[in-house]
């Protein structure tokens, strides 16, 4: 019996379809070509959608996809997926960059050779019955300096291959320290040095506000005369109009593009330049790559739907596979603390302050914050909030979220503190994990306690007077509620005190009403963790 339906669009390789079919729990629905109108009609029944680059997964489509849980992009680029809208709708977006790494790197190398030796132009004239040997004199790559901008999977593979060919490779990546000693022997430099020293420059960065028009008239002016440029990453990183002028002037001796700012593009004036070569976005277009990315993304989607396992996510703060088991106790602690504190509060939520201390800072805190916010918002929104859209939903509802990191506190190697403020009250709870890996609440509203939060609990505050606990026990006994554990805290003798009682069975509202009638009881409520 199939539990999930997944739409496969844009000609996804059949190898991926087989991956989904093999689960026996997912029905793959394949539409290599489908009209927009038809897609908007059928997407409402889909739990997952897998696309290549043609289908626009935009706000309109997402608004029609009532039960959509995940969008998979077979490949790297997600220009056709509205990440912001997907996040707002609580839809996970993932891609499969690894499957096309080798193929795209090889395509870049092919373009590099073609650019250096004028291969496409020479081929074209020969097919036009011209033997123009002297016209297409090229340059050697050996000994030349290649500047690689972006050292992700593809950029690193291009750099490795070009080193093996005898090129001097220098690289710039905004996320790698220029002083880093890389095992590959790559020389890390600033982007300005790449501009000044490289004979060839290839870009391998995503298209963002920071990288758009990264190479423009100003940066080209800093380059060597006769520099050659390659873009097999995303259109728009190299300004096409500025490149056109640089080719005409001879400042840039040649350029090779596999991508354009607008695609498909057969009318670009760049295509009229003799020293410009291009391919129609073929970087990942090999039999092997299409099969691999199809298998990868379908496996990722299946694992998410069937096992709630996340990898390759683009709008979700995931844990690395090796971190999941190691930090699971912190995930458990965060979940229980949030579940506990939200049941203490009344009124409309206004702000959430989360403080992480000590060892917990070693993990992905965005992931923990999403877990905490989901638990805090769930009682109000029910099915409307998940780990993917929790931060967005909080912001949308005007809830201020503050996250801070501090060193380890005295007596605790790790500590998570959540302070929840509403329009009527404020509560703060802190918890830790000891060597036994069990989550413990160690402070509630400034009162020191030590309790493993689990199951049914009664939380009450009282004036610290004799007889309160005895009367409480009597009422619970009369109502057949068995106490499994009791944890007390007080500010001073005779002052305010609080208690947490772990009980073996659910507590009815009428029992709590009786407890509230006890002399010196200030407040009482049931909490279930």
Which residues fall in each region the model found?
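Phosphate-binding beta-alpha-beta segment of Rossmann-like dinucleotide-binding domains, i.e.
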Residues: 89, 97-145, 157-160, 164-165, ...
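Rossmann-like adenosine-cofactor binding region
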Residues: 57-62, 174-269
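Short beta->alpha connector loops at strand-helix junctions that form conserved
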Residues: 31-32, 52, 74-75, 90-102, ...
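Glycine-rich Rossmann-fold phosphate-binding loop(s) that bind the pyrophosphate
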Residues: 151-152
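Oxidoreductase and adenylate-handling cofactor-binding alpha/beta cores
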Residues: 105-124, 144, 163-167, 295-308, ...
């Amino acid at each position: 019996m199939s539990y999930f339906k997944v739409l496969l669009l844009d000609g996804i390789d059949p190898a991926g379809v087989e991956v989904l079919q093999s689960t026996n729990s997912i029905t793959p629905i394949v539409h290599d070509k489908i009209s927009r109108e038809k897609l908007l009609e059928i997407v409402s029944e889909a739990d997952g959608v897998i696309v290549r680059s043609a289908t626009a997964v935009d706000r309109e489509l997402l608004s029609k996809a009532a039960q959509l849980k995940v969008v998979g992009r077979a490949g790297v680029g997600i220009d056709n997926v509205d990440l912001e809208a997907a996040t707002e709708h609580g839809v996970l977006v993932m891609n499969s960059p690894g499957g096309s790494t080798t193929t795209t790197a090889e395509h870049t190398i092919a373009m590099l050779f073609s650019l250096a030796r004028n291969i496409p132009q020479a081929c074209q004239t020969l097919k036009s019955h011209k033997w123009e040997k002297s016209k297409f004199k090229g340059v050697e790559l050996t000994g030349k300096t290649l500047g690689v901008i972006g050292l992700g999977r593809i950029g690193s593979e291009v750099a490795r291959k070009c080193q093996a060919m005898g090129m001097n490779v220098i690289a710039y990546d905004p996320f790698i320290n220029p002083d880093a000693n890389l095992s590959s022997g790559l020389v890390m430099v600033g982007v300005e040095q790449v501009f000044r020293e490289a004979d060839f420059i290839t870009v391998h960065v995503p298209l963002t506000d920071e990288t758009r028009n990264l190479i423009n008239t100003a940066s080209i002016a800093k380059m060597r005369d006769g520099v050659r440029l390659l873009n097999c990453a995303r259109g728009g990183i190299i300004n096409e109009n500025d490149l056109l002028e640089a080719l005409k002037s001879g400042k840039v001796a040649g350029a090779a593009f596999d991508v354009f700012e607008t695609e498909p593009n057969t009318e670009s004036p760049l295509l009229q330049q003799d020293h410009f070569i291009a391919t129609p976005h073929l970087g990942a277009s090999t039999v092997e790559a299409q099969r691999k990315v199809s298998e990868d993304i379908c496996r990722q989607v299946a694992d998410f739907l069937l096992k709630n396992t996340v990898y390759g996510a683009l709008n979700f703060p995931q844990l690395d596979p090796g971190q999941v088991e190691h930090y699971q106790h912190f995930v458990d602690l965060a979940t229980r603390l949030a579940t506990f504190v939200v049941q203490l509060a009344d009124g409309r939520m206004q702000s959430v302050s989360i403080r992480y201390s000590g060892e917990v800072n070693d993990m992905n805190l965005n992931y923990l914050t999403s877990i905490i916010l989901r638990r805090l918002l769930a009682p109000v929104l029910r099915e409307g909030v998940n780990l993917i859209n929790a931060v967005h939903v909080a912001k949308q509802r005007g809830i201020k979220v503050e996250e801070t990191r501090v060193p380890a506190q005295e007596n605790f190697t790790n500590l998570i503190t959540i302070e929840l403020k509403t329009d009527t009250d404020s509560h703060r709870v802190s918890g830790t994990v000891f060597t036994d890996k069990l989550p413990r609440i160690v402070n509630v509203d400034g009162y020191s306690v030590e309790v493993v939060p689990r199951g049914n609990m009664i939380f009450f505050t009282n004036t610290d007077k004799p007889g309160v606990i005895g009367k409480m026990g009597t009422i619970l006994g009369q109502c057949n509620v068995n106490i499994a554990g009791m944890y007390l805290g007080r500010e001073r003798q005779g002052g305010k005190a609080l208690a947490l009682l772990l009980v073996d069975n659910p507590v009815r509202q009428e029992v709590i009403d009786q407890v509230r009638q006890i002399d010196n009881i200030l407040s009482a409520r049931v909490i279930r963790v």
